[in-house]
Amino acid sequence: MNKLALYCRMGFEREMAAEITDKAAEKGVFGFVRVIENSGYVIFECYQADEADYLARELDFQQLIFARQMLVVSDLLTDLPQQDRITPIVQQYQQIADKIDLKQSTELLVETADTNEAKELLGFCRKFTVPLRQTLKKQGWLRASNHAKCGLFLHLFFLRNNACYVGYSYNHNHSAHLMGIQRLKFPADAPSRSTLKLEEAILTFIPRQKETEWLNENQYAVDLGACPGGWTYQLVKRGLFVYAVDHGKMAASLHETGRIEHCAEDGFKFQPPKRQKIDWLVCDMVEKPSRIAELMTKWLLNGWCHSMIFNLKLPMKKRYAEVQQCLQYIADKLTQRGLAFQLKAKHLYHDREEITVYLRLL
């Protein structure tokens, strides 16, 4: 078991490969990446046998930008017999159980990649889950409580209906969602589908127990590039008053709430009203990521806000390098000023050729 499988958005396999290579090296782990273009996943093969498990425990999943899921996997099982796929899978898990206590397992996820071709397997995966779960429980697995120390999820990652990786992830260091995807329902009254990006960002970056404390009716926000109001909608829904900055029109439904002021200005030139404390800045403007990074940094250095969520658009070829440069620029500028901060970034399911960044002064 010297392999990690990392799920990612189709077309971002090279970024995922570069990131896991860098982050593993920081932990003193080296290996090579197997990349298939547009497959929606990569396999990182460690040079030493137990290092994949070490990374699954110790490499902070929340710090991986392009990974939707991270799990330790076996060699690929191929030519699974159609009449009995379960037996070879259980045999593989029995080998894993010699080193890993599978009695600590709490859940089973039977998954495939998030590609148009692989999605055809989803129906099969759903049907296969029930009989496999019953068989694994007979082995004494999948019976631990959700609060089990060192709890595990068991995963099957199908490439075809007769070929899969068998693996596991650690409950404290993974995504609990099937395929690593947090699926959200589009609100019927939202002005645009971009609203789901900010909703997913809030659910991803802000601790559930802190959401109402950090986002409530006593707070003020600025939305740069707000039109028609997809991101403003999420803030107003949580009670915030929003200065919506855009030359374009905002949805009438948002004006009717009485919780927005439309500022028909350039997002790069706008400054918050004097003597008005701004808690949050959000920004989904289509612009070079370096310009957005500079603008966001300016807001923090000027003391105009203390928390922000923004997107960095990535249409260029060297996307991973661009992300690293932008995040390093922000971190360097804030550190030089002596500011303590929390910085997280993620390629969210509802993002496309972009990543979402969460930044908060401490």
From Swiss-Prot:
CC annotations in GO: cytoplasm
Cytoplasm found in the keyword field: yes
One Pfam entry name: RLMM_N
Enzyme class per UniProt: transferase
Molecular function per GO: S-adenosylmethionine-dependent methyltransferase activity
Domain of life: Bacteria
Active-site residue numbers: 313
Catalytic reactions on record: cytidine(2498) in 23S rRNA + S-adenosyl-L-methionine = 2'-O-methylcytidine(2498) in 23S rRNA + S-adenosyl-L-homocysteine + H(+)
Primary location group: cytoplasm
GO BP, one annotated term: methylation
Statement: the UniProt record of this protein carries the keyword NAD: no
Binding site residues for S-adenosyl-L-methionine: 194, 227-230, 246, 266, 284
EC number: 2.1.1.186
Compartments, record wording: Cytoplasm
Alphabetized UniProt keyword annotations: Cytoplasm, Methyltransferase, rRNA processing, S-adenosyl-L-methionine, Transferase
Subunit structure: Monomer.
Function noted in UniProt: Catalyzes the 2'-O-methylation at nucleotide C2498 in 23S rRNA.
Family: Belongs to the class I-like SAM-binding methyltransferase superfamily. RNA methyltransferase RlmE family. RlmM subfamily.
Protein name per the record: Ribosomal RNA large subunit methyltransferase M
Organism this protein belongs to: Aggregatibacter aphrophilus (strain NJ8700) (Haemophilus aphrophilus)
